[in-house]
């Protein structure tokens, strides 16, 4: 959502959102290192609201990806240090309500990936600048458990270009996990906090081992009463079983550790 108190609501859009800039403190309290802005709500209240979002995040010293005042900035990667290694983060959207939101058509705007060419190129450009490349993509259909075929095809193109992890969002419900050439694709994490009618979701712990392999641990959570809490015991196991069932060729053990068959 844009951090703003101004702007004009987008026409012919059922759901539009914005939040007071002071709520950026919630991201700070959570320890957010990078914010992804490539989604179908970033321009709900127009370009001024998106510019306010950039300002709010800059003042909070939270780097952002997936949007910018210029094409160069929207396509820019953010590099973060984790465990003594350098991780490059890119973000793009495959879901926007009108073509004018695409940075190719307006500024400010969003980095989009309806055509994979530009994101593939950016992955190749930053691969040599970091140890790992993580790609976040806003894609798919809302409330759909399984990814669309285009999601699977795009993810494989990103991995062929050099991505070490692909993580998606947008469907509002969890989607499964798949490995391609040993690289994990997490199609959708669901909602971290949202409508209480969509309670099942999960967080993801990522560990790169000394061989450079990407290891995943699923942390199952629910969002009852608009609060996110970790599932334990039988509830956690039920979620592991469910997620394994909607995934592609993976096992999830009793601790949430993911492996491919």
Question: Model regions: which residues?
Answer:
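Acidic, metal/ion-coordinating pockets
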Residues: 1-261
């Amino acid at each position: 959502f844009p951090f703003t108190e101004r702007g004009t609501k987008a026409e012919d859009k059922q759901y539009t959102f914005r939040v007071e800039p002071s709520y950026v403190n919630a991201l700070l309290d959570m320890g957010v290192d990078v914010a992804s802005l490539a989604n179908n709500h970033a321009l709900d209240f127009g370009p001024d609201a998106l510019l306010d979002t950039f300002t709010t995040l800059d003042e909070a010293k939270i780097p952002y990806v997936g949007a910018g005042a210029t094409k160069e900035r929207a396509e820019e990667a953010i590099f973060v240090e984790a465990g003594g290694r350098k991780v490059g983060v890119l973000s793009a959207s495959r879901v926007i309500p009108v073509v004018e939101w695409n940075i190719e058509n307006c500024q400010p705007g969003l980095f989009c990936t309806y055509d994979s060419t530009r994101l593939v190129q950016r992955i190749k450009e930053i691969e040599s600048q970091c140890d790992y490349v993580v790609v976040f993509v806003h894609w798919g259909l809302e409330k759909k458990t399984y990814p669309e075929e285009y999601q699977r095809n795009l993810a494989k193109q990103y991995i062929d270009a050099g991505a070490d992890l692909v993580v998606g969002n947008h469907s509002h419900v969890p989607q499964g996990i798949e490995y391609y050439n040993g690289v994990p694709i997490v199609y959708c994490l669901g909602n971290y906090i949202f409508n209480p009618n969509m309670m099942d979701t999960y967080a993801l712990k990522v560990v790169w081992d000394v061989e450079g392999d990407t290891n995943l641990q699923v942390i199952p959570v629910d969002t009852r009463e608009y609060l996110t809490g970790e599932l334990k015991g039988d509830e956690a196991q039920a979620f592991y079983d469910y997620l394994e069932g909607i995934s592609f060729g993976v096992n999830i053990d009793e601790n949430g550790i993911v492996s491919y068959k």
